Regions:
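All-alpha prenyltransferase/terpene-synthase fold signal
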Residues: 1-289
Length: 289
């Protein structure tokens, strides 16, 4: 089964279990709307890629970890779009969840996805219960405090912000979790994989800053120029377009260099390179700034 099929199957199973008889119909609809169709699914793909290079001896657990990470990412998008944060009308080319279902259901479905992520992980660990606690800690730390997504969102409420700390918490933390959880799900030492996630996560946020500044709504499927409008920390504001583009290239190179020697190293490096090319604004794809 392909990686994409594994991710889709795990997410479909999780959503189906959460929306069985008894679930309020509109909440069930909002959950499905939030998860499908997905974006690039880069975080779960990264999780499964690392699990694969580490032997993937527990594919059901790796799939559950990948699905949990994607559910947490989807939850963060729903909450990020809320009127109290970005007040974004679009996400992935369609109305954001609070626009489609109202603010109350958007809050509830975001919360429900956070819970569902850990339920999914627990269900997937029945054959390897000894691996569950490390996975819970890894993935929990990536979304909570002091260095997870919640902390990253909170940095937007502070008068002074370290750009690196903001990027690491808001975006990088879940990339770290994807890499570390992939190794943990396969019963491997996760330590060598942390650096891959740290560099790749920061690279992804720098790319997002560049796309927010340089792309249009049709290209991104969501509002643009939001960093400037909301006064949020941005690599473009701090470094300029040329500086941010160079920072992105440096971070991608560092992520590739961090991939440890293993049977699937070349494939993983190719995945990182391909993803970095995908997220670059078109005008920068060939190195122009």
């Amino acid at each position: 089964m392909s990686v994409s099929s594994r991710i889709d199957e795990a997410l479909n199973e999780a959503v189906a279990l959460a929306t069985t008889v008894g679930c309020p119909p509109r909440l069930a609809e909002a959950l499905h709307y939030s998860v499908f169709p997905g974006g690039a699914r880069v975080r779960p793909r990264l999780c499964l890629a690392v699990a694969g290079t580490c032997g993937d001896d527990a594919p059901a657990l790796a799939d559950a970890a990948a699905a949990a990470i994607e559910l947490l990412h989807c939850a963060s998008l729903v909450h990020d779009d809320l009127p109290c944060f970005d007040d974004a009308p679009l996400r992935r080319g369609k109305p954001s969840v609070h626009q489609a279902f109202g603010e109350r259901l958007a809050v509830l479905v975001g919360d429900a996805m956070i819970v569902l992520a850990f339920q999914t992980l627990a269900r997937g660990a029945t054959a390897h219960p000894e691996r569950l606690v490390p996975l819970l800690l890894t993935i929990g730390e990536s979304v909570g405090m002091p260095l997870g997504i919640a902390a990253g969102q909170a940095w937007e409420c502070e008068p002074r912000v370290s750009l690196s700390a903001y990027h690491h918490a808001k975006t990088g933390s879940l990339f770290v979790a994807a890499c570390v959880a992939g190794a943990q799900a396969a019963g491997a030492d996760p330590a060598p994989w942390r650096g891959v996630g740290e560099y790749l996560g920061e690279a992804y946020q720098v790319a997002d800053d560049l796309r927010d500044a340089l792309c249009d709504v049709d290209e991104l499927g969501k509002p643009v120029q939001r960093d400037a409008q909301l006064g949020r920390p941005s690599a473009v504001e701090e470094l300029g377009v040329a500086g941010a583009a160079q920072r992105l290239r440096d971070l991608v190179a560092a992520a590739v260099a961090q991939v440890p020697a293993c049977p699937g190293a070349d494939n993983l490096k190719a995945l990182i390179a391909g993803e970095s090319a995908r997220i670059l604004p078109k005008g920068l794809a060939g190195g122009e700034v």
